[in-house]
Regions:
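Chalcogenol-based redox active-site neighborhoods
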Residues: 3-161
Length: 161
């Protein structure tokens, strides 16, 4: 006990996602980006934050992408990856829920933005939110440290089982 449930800060902050409907053919009529917030997703959500999609330690993108079944088995309805920068880079290709915190609104609300640095990177964290939007768990990791799939899945298990 001791951890009181509270609504996830910044859950209504508008993040951008590459529009899955977008294609070169439809570029004229379809915006390349959609605005979504964490509140727009339903169910039990595991939010994994990464500094950016362009930088170091990008194998975490593949870890998440290739192990979606493990997250689902751990009880997560949605796995949402939030980055600070470079949503257009190749690292995040194939991740349906890759969002960029363009205005750093989500990062600031959750104290994930780097202190005193003019960078847009977000610190690494795994944040679980239940179906009511309440934050159940948060596990921060070292900015430059790569997490393992086991560690990320364990966070979901702890939160949702």
């Amino acid at each position: 006990g001791g951890f009181s449930m509270a609504k996830l800060p910044g859950s209504d902050a508008k993040l951008i996602r590459l529009n899955p409907e977008w294609s070169v053919e439809k570029a004229a009529s379809t915006p390349i980006e959609q605005e979504l917030s964490i509140d727009d997703f339903k169910g039990k959500r595991l939010i994994i934050t990464l500094p950016g999609a362009g930088g170091f330690c990008n194998k975490e993108f593949d870890l998440v992408k290739d192990n979606m079944d493990k997250f689902k088995a751990a009880g997560a309805d949605e796995v949402i990856v939030v980055v600070g920068t470079d949503i257009l880079s190749n690292a995040g290709r194939g991740l349906p829920n890759l969002l960029q915190d363009v205005n750093q609104e989500f990062g600031n609300a959750n104290k994930l933005t780097l202190e005193g640095v003019k960078s847009r990177y977000l610190n690494r964290s795994a944040i679980a939110v239940d179906a009511n939007g309440e934050q159940v768990i948060r596990e921060d990791a070292d900015l430059l440290g790569c997490r393992t799939i086991g560690g990320l899945v364990d966070a979901a298990k702890k939160a949702f089982s």
